[in-house]
């Protein structure tokens, strides 16, 4: 397992092993959490790993987007770890996507995704972006190549 700084190597190894074409057109997102939910959780210690289980890797392409499940776990000794990419893989044609927008917030980026009547929000937190050049480069690549709508 590697740290967030090296997640791109793990993701790209998975893509190469499975003959999936990619460039810098992918990002990893955490599920959207509500701070109030975390703060007022009934348990004495909030289980962040429970919420991180719904993390995804999104591969943005001109004709479709591919969504890959992944396991993200928080370990005190080694930080946030990424593993088991692609247990679930879904390919969604672009014409079925109603909204696909990346919005820059104060402390994070949020991805808004709507497919017909189903909508989801995911996030890339500020701590996830700092010193993770691959994340910033990939966001810039997606914007420059118009693979995602971007709003500041």
What kind of feature is each model-predicted range?
Residues 1-62, 68:
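Anionic N-terminal interaction surfaces
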Residues 2-10, 18, 65, 72-74, ...:
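Generic ordered-secondary-structure signal
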Residues 35-38, 64-68, 74-76, 118-124:
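Short, surface-exposed beta-strand/loop "edge" segments at domain boundaries and coil↔beta transitions
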Residues 43-108:
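Phosphoinositide-binding peripheral membrane targeting modules
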Residues 82-152:
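Acidic, Ser/Thr- and proline-rich intrinsically disordered linker/docking segments
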